[in-house]
Amino acid sequence: MCSSHGSPTSSSPPKRPADPAILARLADAHCHPSDDECFEGALESNASSKLGTICAMSSSLENQEITTKLWERNKNKILPCYGLHPWFIHSLSLSNSPTVPTREEHYTALFPSSTDVSQPSPSLATLLPFLPPPLLLSDFLSTLTNNLEAHPTALVGEIGLDKAFRIPNPPELASSAKNSDLQTPLSHQIAVAEAQIRVAIRLERHVSFHSVRAPQDTVRLLERIRGEPDGWGRVHVCLHSFGGSPETAKQVQKMHPNAFFSFSTIISGRSPRFHELLRAINPDRLLVESDFSHTSQLDAQVWEVFEQICEAREWSAEECVERLETNWRNFLELEPEGTGGRRKTKKQRRLEKAPVAEEVDEVEESNPK
């Protein structure tokens, strides 16, 4: 999910017209039709899309249900995904009490003053009336579990970490800047992301993960989970619209054989090293995505990144679509019991030993708001 996922602006014109036969073999691994401003338009666009699969992410508390409705209207094409995006987790309370804290109690604890943690942030008083009522994390996890159990093929997404996001000011505060200075603490983000990953592991569902300006934190989170014998290697994680450096991508691939990478031109394509990054990914771990909510633009966006991959990897269109088609099919499969990651092809039988986690370069990504 990105600042432009609702914008129909394309990053560059296509080099050739989109081929419907190729699109039919591709999956948009990450998009946001549940955020389309026109629900009926989203239904129509999803039905007319030439893509083989549309992986529809949930992001906020409100659009989990919309994702279900989209799937109900187009079960052959929509793959529903349920989860809470880091932009929307500030309403979740980590309290172990069965009683939901008051709005003031919850947000005062979540957004303390930078100079005195016993006091709330000075910005909170103005914003507090506009913030959503608190919800226990345990209650949301119950909803997440119910949605996944009701949809046996559903994935977990979109979840993750975002160190760029600031809580937006509401329209009622017209004289204020677009964003406040309030940022959901990283510790809170990690707790919520990890809790959702635990649900994914327990129910054996794959994960779509958002990481903005948090490469080291993402690596550490995944490494900690990988070190526990709880079935993490059975499921796959897709690092969507990956914007890290080629060096970071190589490190993640060595450490996490169950990691895939999906790319969009609207986000990943901003990097001057985009083609170098595409070449740094193992050919069997590449996926494509649009990261768009304007569903009428999904085909064009996926086609655009498809062309970029062909160019960067010097693949023919047929070779590229064959690889992406196989990769998507492999992504959806579970690994055998007792494995620590993806099964290797005949050319990849040599086991990779995961190195000790090293510091990695910070990813330069724009503020999503």
Roles of regions detected by a PLM:
Residues 1-12, 303-369:
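Mid-to-C-terminal alpha-helical segments outside catalytic/metal-binding sites
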Residues 1-82, 88-93, 97, 142-145, ...:
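An N-terminally biased module of ancient metal coordination in phosphate/nucleic-acid-related enzymes
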Residues 284-299:
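Short acidic/histidine-rich active-site segments
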Residues 256-271, 292:
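His/Asp/Glu-enriched short active-site or ligand-binding loop at hydrolase and phosphoryl-transfer sites
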Residues 77-83, 236, 259-265, 340-341:
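Short hydrophobic/aromatic-enriched beta-strand-loop microsegments
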Residues 245-255, 270-280:
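Short loop-to-alpha-helix "cap/lid" segments that border enzyme active sites
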Residues 127-143:
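Glycine-rich anion/phosphate-binding loops
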Residues 84, 88-130, 163-182, 302-309:
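Active-site gating loops and adjacent loop-to-helix segments of metal-dependent hydrolytic enzymes
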